[in-house]
UniProtKB/Swiss-Prot annotation:
Protein name: Sterol regulatory element-binding protein cleavage-activating protein
Phosphoserine PTM sites in chain numbering: 821, 837, 843, 850, 936
Native organism taxonomy: Eukaryota, Metazoa, Chordata, Craniata, Vertebrata
Chain residue ranges for the region called Disordered: 60-81, 588-617, 668-696, 834-868, 883-903, 925-959
GO molecular function: sterol binding
WD repeat placement: 770-810, 952-1002, 1005-1042, 1077-1114, 1117-1155, 1158-1195, 1197-1235
Region span, Loop-7: 535-710
Organism: Sus scrofa (Pig)
Biased composition (Basic and acidic residues): 885-896
Start and end residues of each stretch annotated as Loop-1: 46-284
Region described as Interaction with SREBF2: spans on this chain: 730-1279
Domain notes per entry: Loop-1 binds to loop-7, enabling interaction with COPII-coated vesicles. When levels of cholesterol in the endoplasmic reticulum increase, Loop-1 binds to cholesterol instead, thereby disrupting direct binding between the two loops and preventing the SCAP-SREBP complex from exiting the endoplasmic reticulum.
GO cellular component, one term: Golgi membrane
Gene: SCAP
Chain ranges for the short sequence motif ER export signal as given in the UniProt record: 447-452
Glycosylation site positions: 263, 590, 641
């Protein structure tokens, strides 16, 4: 077994066990899943509901004044300003955005030096802001006069009293962690620990203390030991109560003068007013509710054709809850992990619903309801999950692999998408497995307990069928016989779920193939590939930076190549006209930036191993507050008991501040314990590795030509579309669509309704292998795959080789009275029979060319065996040349294997006069028996000893006398290995050797005859005419040799039974007896899976345990005698009776699963496949039923007398008999595949019985002859 097969087996077993667990304990699992959903959705309480997010309004800074308290526009006139923009805001927010870095970076610096010195400059900035005073003609104005004065914090925030300001201006900075004391900061050995000590230990999704003081999201601050960018960002937040334009302008000018930002291009032109809502409105809910209603309708109409579901609405609701809960869990977990998804985004919902939601739900439902309906609910759930386990896990692994590859592209946009997709996949998989599977098991259990016991007959529910061409005929009409041997009667399309409408076929095709998942996965791969290669912060830039850093020259060792003036314009606005990208000029080691003083450290201290990170400003820095949590500002004001509900705040333009620190400052600000740290500084990333936003004018923008990638993406999309069209063509178009001469007008064989596309079934004629050897009609047939045993009404048993058709042994009817008993009389009977037969070995030529009769040597016979016979040695004539030659036949016969010749087949020398004279001389009178009755075409009841005859007197043959048997005729017959078990009308059970023809053992005679037998392993069960059961066991006193096994198991069969040696002693013991199993004779007996099922004329069935004959259940559901029973290894039990009804039973619980009114008259034959129930009756009608729903799919009208001739070759192939022919049908669609005529001479003989062997052969009973037909090769390929 390969690794893939072992892995597949493990996954299947795990899903099987999970299905058993979910179906066994549904309520606890649903409660546990609900608690998990609530726990994962807890962070959503901190997120806004759809439609309740903050609303923004932008106004220019120039000439700004707070709006009046009352709106002055008329109600009917449109206004550019929103309704909430009335009066002064709660506060004005001014953020001073600081970007700081240590430049140049030395090799001996530590990772903690990246952020310790930049953070220490926050104290200086705060001091400069607090000391700023505006002096103008109106006087002086300080910060205390214009800022928002706050009082005490809320009583529950005692831990934050030393951090957040109280009784003064609301000013926030990272220095608040150390109470704005620089000495505390320098004395702190663990800065990161101090920053994170107030982080909540529980689930918390609102603004944290770190975000409030830093003013930027945590991942953008750069305060980490693992940061690649040696750039620290934070803000100093000022909250003003009044807007004072002059004070704000002077503060901005002073800070930009003290800390200039040469390459900054931030615009200070507009104010952003943010309004916070309080309650959700009905209008905002309409789009979301509409989306889920459409989803609910889609699932309902996709599952409404699934008949084995109790509540279609409930299933659709469970699917919607699954998808919705998956969406909510994904958003909640992503919010918990630091991502900030929004429920308003249109890109989240389609991915979760289409890719990981609906397809698995639909596939799981179809897989579970397609399991055998007679199984227990938990077994059906387990089998359904196990069958789809490999495809679910394979798709899951593929999607996770794509997401993992996308995450390592190092593109921030792709990484954020991949993180959200991983959480969505895992949450959806978690919900589908425990929750939806458990809900499905509850629904199927309700269906089993409620609906199936109350289901009306399907005929009572069928709508009247519309006539299509000719009237549909459900039953056989004796007055009008069809012109063709078969008439197909189909049910209406609403009840025939095998041929689905094209719309549903497309839906199930898309769900079964996971086409949507595959298309979106392919699109995701293409998108990730293009974005990863073309994005300036992607993998290509990272690899280029790594190669440059590992180069011995380094990037800083090379000066840019000068370009002669006049060749190309030096500063063309279009980068496509420049050979070199418009990068900022690289500095040599002895150069400094303009406006920056030279470093005092000299040449020795300026040596560094990597260039310093360049501080850049982009448009995204103007509105960095948008990346904060939407509850950032409400949380801050709520600490001081200020609510922002139905109010707004105004955000002023950001003041940029750039700080460049030299390595000496970093070394001076280092704590003594920092030198003991083992952390090494990470390698810097070039070009802004983690920054995917657009850059300013001074940022390097590489020329990107994406034409090649567009062409590749277009070609890939075209290929995917072509494959999709080909798949849809195979689904929608018929098999011979577009072929000439195949139109609907050219139909043969009587316009068969099953021929939907004008397909004409082929007709062939083959010469069968005819098995002849019985003088009367064959009543019993049995086979174990290698041997075939037949018994006729005369009591003669023939053993045939199922491969070659040779007659191996003939067991005679022991009807001749013997004076001796015991083994001698048996041997004598065998000896006399062999004198009459030819040993079963004949060539397939004409009968006249057959070899002389042969005799199986038995050794020297005992003298006492022939005491009652005359001495005929004097009659032996060795002069063969004088004998007349037999006339040759004019026409050849079909090839045959015969056990004896009929008198009309050949003529020979008449020995009657010689034998008669020898009898007279010995004083013996031969006895004659009456001629046998002509065979009856119908079922023949068991014959009594007085009714039975023997061989007719043949012309030219010795008149051996066969008296009526005292042992009774054969009523039942079974075969296993090389043992034949025979049940006689006298009540005697006999075990014969099929190869040697010897009687191995027998039981004592009982007054009641044996009507049915079961021979399974070493157990024999005999059902008697008085309703009793006898359980026998076979024992052998010689161990079996490992080589004593015949052949290999055939297709779909169990291993071949052992062959008992002739030296073994076989003993049959009676182990149990059930004296009153039924009140009337037992008419049907079957055994499988350790269970024995009996059917009787008392209208009941009983289920016994085979090992101890314990009666488990008595099944009552028929209103007539039981005529046929079916049971297999999967414990599928079906029964048919004289009332024409078919019942399906659950063997494990003894309950009736389904009840179907099948035929007008007795049900003569019954068999099942994995999805269908096939029945035949005396009305010569074969009906095929859906096993899960009990609805008739279609029926096949048989020839007169051929109603019981059917056999199942496989789950998809059915064979039926007709007048001298057999027909093969496709069980899935009811199509006639092929009709095989068995020669022209047998056309008038109906096939009364069909037995399917394991070697792809079929045995047809044509009265006293058997025909061995091999399945056509085209059908074997189809199977």
């Amino acid at each position: 077994m390969t690794l893939t097969e072992r892995l597949r087996e493990k996954i299947s077993q795990a899903f099987y066990n999970h299905g058993l667990l979910c179906a066994s304990y549904p309520i606890p699992i649903i409660l546990f899943t609900g608690l998990c959903i609530l726990a994962c959705c807890y962070p959503l309480l901190k997120l806004p509901l759809p439609g309740t997010g903050p609303v923004e309004f932008t106004t220019p800074v120039k000439d700004y004044s707070p709006p009046p308290s009352a709106s002055d526009h008329k109600p009917g006139e449109p206004s550019e300003q929103p309704e909430w923009y009335v009066g002064a805001p709660v506060a004005y927010i001014q953020q001073i955005f600081v970007k700081s870095s240590v430049s140049p970076w030395h090799k001996n610096l530590l990772a903690v030096d990246v952020f310790r010195s930049p953070l220490s400059r926050a104290f200086q900035l705060v001091e400069e802001i607090r000391n700023h005073v505006l002096r103008d003609s109106s006087g002086t104005r300080s910060l205390e006069e214009v800022c928002l004065q706050v009082t005490d914090l809320l009583p529950g925030l005692r831990k934050l009293r030393n951090i957040l300001p109280e009784h003064g201006c609301l000013l926030l900075s990272p220095g608040n962690f150390w109470q704005n004391d620089r000495e505390r900061f320098h004395a702190d050995p663990d800065i990161i620990g101090t920053i994170h000590q107030h982080e909540p230990k529980t689930l918390q999704t609102s603004a944290t203390l770190k975000d409030l003081l830093f003013g930027v999201p945590g991942k953008h601050s750069g305060v980490s030991l693992y940061t690649r960018k040696r750039l620290v960002s934070y803000t100093i937040t000022l909250v003003f109560q009044h807007y004072h334009a002059k004070f704000l302008g002077s503060l901005r000018a002073r800070l930009m003068l003290l800390h200039p930002s040469p390459n900054c291009s931030l615009r200070a032109e507009s104010l952003v007013h943010v309004h916070f809502k309080e309650e959700i409105g009905i209008a905002e809910l309409i789009p979301l509710v509409t989306t889920y209603i459409i989803l609910f309708a889609y699932i309902y109409f996709s599952t409404r054709k699934i008949d084995m579901v109790k509540s279609k609405w409930g299933l659709a609701l469970a699917a919607v809850v699954t998808v919705l809960s998956s969406l909510l869990m994904s958003v909640g977990l992503c919010t918990l992990f630091g991502l900030t998804p929004t429920l308003n985004g249109g890109e989240i919902f389609p991915y979760l619903v289409v890719v990981i939601g609906l397809e698995n739900v639909l596939v799981l439902t179809k897989s579970v309801v397609s399991t055998p309906v007679d199984l227990e609910v938990k077994l059906r759930i387990a089998q359904g999950l196990s069958s789809e386990s490999w495809s679910i896990m394979k798709n899951m692994a593929t999607e996770l692999g794509i997401i993992l590859i996308g995450y390592f592209t190092l593109v921030p946009a792709i990484q954020e998408f991949c993180l959200f997709a991983v959480v969505g996949l895992v949450s959806d998989f978690f919900l589908q497995m425990p929750f939806f599977t458990t809900v499905l098991s509850i629904d199927i259990r309700r269906m089993e307990l409620a609906d199936l016991n109350k289901r009306l007959p399907p005929e009572a529910c069928l709508p009247p069928a519309k006539p299509v061409g000719r009237s549909a005929r459900f039953e056989r009409q004796l007055a009008v016989r069809p012109a063709t041997p078969h008439t197909i009667t189909l049910q209406p399309s609403s009840f025939r779920n095998l041929r689905l409408p094209k719309r549903l076929r497309v839906i199930y095709f898309l769900a079964r193939t996971r086409l949507a998942q595959r298309l979106i996965m392919a699109g995701t791969v293409v998108w990730i590939g293009i974005l990863a290669y073309t994005d300036p912060a992607g993998l290509r830039t990272y690899l280029a930076a790594q190669v440059t850093e590992q180069s011995p020259l380094g990037e800083g060792a090379l000066a840019p190549m000068p370009v002669p003036s006049g060749v190309l314009p030096a500063s063309h606005p279009d980068p496509a006209f420049s050979i070199f990208p418009p990068e900022a000029p690289k500095l040599l080691e002895n150069q400094t930036l303009p406006g920056e003083p030279p470093e005092p450290g000299g040449q020795a201290e300026g040596v560094h191993d990597s260039p310093a990170p360049e501080v850049t400003w982009g448009p995204e820095d103007e509105e960095l507050w948008r990346k904060l949590s939407f509850r950032h500002w409400p949380t801050l004001f709520s600490y001081y008991n200020i609510t922002l509900a139905k109010r707004y705040i105004s955000l002023l333009p950001v003041i940029p501040v750039t700080l460049r620190l030299n390595p000496r400052e970093a070394l001076e600000g280092r704590h003594p314990q920092d030198s003991r740290s083992a952390w090494s500084p990470p390698q810097p990333a070039q070009g802004g590795l983690w920054d995917a936003g657009p850059k300013g004018p001074g940022v390097a923008q590489a020329h990107r030509d994406v034409t090649l990638y567009k062409v590749a993406a277009l070609g890939l999309a075209t290929g995917i579309l072509l494959v999709l069209l080909l798949c849809l063509y195979r689904v929608l178009c018929p098999r011979n669509y577009g072929q000439p001469g195949a139109g609907p007008g050219r139909r043969r064989r009587g316009e068969l309704p099953c021929d939907d596309y004008g397909y004409a079934p082929p007709e062939t004629e083959i010469v069968p292998l005819v098995l002849r050897g019985h003088l009367m009609d064959i009543e019993c047939l049995a086979s174990d795959g290698m041997l075939l045993v037949s018994c006729c009404l005369a009591g003669h048993v023939c053993v045939w080789d199922a491969q070659t058709g040779d007659c191996l042994t003939r067991i005679p009817h022991p009807g001749r009275q013997r004076r001796d008993s015991g083994v001698g009389s048996v041997l004598e009977a065998q000896e006399n029979w062999e004198r009459l037969s030819d040993g079963g070995k004949a060539s397939p030529e004409e009968p006249g060319d057959s070899p002389p009769l042969r005799h199986r040597p038995r050794g020297t016979p005992l003298p006492s065996l022939f005491g009652d016979q005359p001495d005929l040695t004097c009659l032996i004539d060795t002069n063969f040349s004088a004998h007349p030659r037999l006339p040759e036949l004019d026409h050849p016969e079909p090839r045959h294997r015969s056990g004896c010749r009929r008198t009309q087949d050949c003529t020979g020398y008449d020995f009657s006069r010689l034998v008669q004279r020898a009898y007279q001389e010995e004083g013996m009178v031969p006895m004659h028996t009456p001629a046998p009755r002509p065979p009856s075409p119908g079922p023949t009841p068991p014959q009594t000893p007085e009714d039975e005859g023997s061989f007719p007197p043949e012309k030219g043959s010795p008149s051996f006398t066969w008296a009526p048997s005292a042992d009774g005729s054969i009523w039942s017959l079974e075969l296993q290995g090389n043992l034949i078990v025979v049940g006689r009308s006298s009540g005697r059970l006999e075990v014969w050797d099929a190869i040697e023809g010897m009687l191995r053992c027998s039981s004592e005679e009982v007054a009641s005859g044996i009507t049915a037998l079961v021979f399974l392993d070493k157990r024999i069960v005999a059902a008697r005419l008085n309703g009793s059961l006898d359980f026998f066991s076979l024992e052998t006193h010689t161990a079996l040799s490992p080589l004593q096994f015949r052949g290999a198991p055939g297709r779909g069969s169990s291993p071949t039974s052992p062959v008992y040696s002739s030296s073994d002693t076989v003993v049959c013991h009676l182990t149990h007896t059930v004296p009153c199993a039924h009140q009337k004779p037992i008419t049907a007996l079957k055994a499988a899976a350790g269970r024995l099922v009996t059917g009787s004329q008392d209208h009941t069935l009983r289920v016994f345990r085979l090992e101890d004959s314990c009666c488990l259940f008595t099944l009552q559901g028929h209103s007539g005698a039981i005529t046929t029973v079916y049971i297999d290894q999967t414990m599928v039990l079906a029964s048919g009776g004289q009332d024409g009804a078919i019942c399906l039973w659950d063997v494990l619980t003894g309950s009736r699963v389904s009840h179907m009114f099948a035929h007008r008259g007795d049900v003569t034959s019954l068999t099942c496949t994995t999805s269908c129930v096939i029945s035949s009756g005396l009305d010569d009608l074969i009906s095929i039923w859906d096993r899960s729903t009990g609805i008739k799919l279609y029926s096949i009208q048989q020839d007169l007398g051929c109603g019981a001739s059917l056999g199942v070759i496989s789950d998809n192939l059915l064979v039926t008999g007709g007048q001298g022919c057999v027909s093969f049908w496709d069980l899935n669609y009811g199509d006639l595949l092929q009709t095989v005529y068995l020669g022209k001479d047998s056309e008038a003989q109906p096939a009364r019985q069909i037995l399917v062997l394991d070697n792809a052969a079929i045995v047809c009973n044509f009265g006293s002859e058997l025909s061995l037909v091999y399945v056509p090769s085209v059908l074997e390929k189809l199977d």
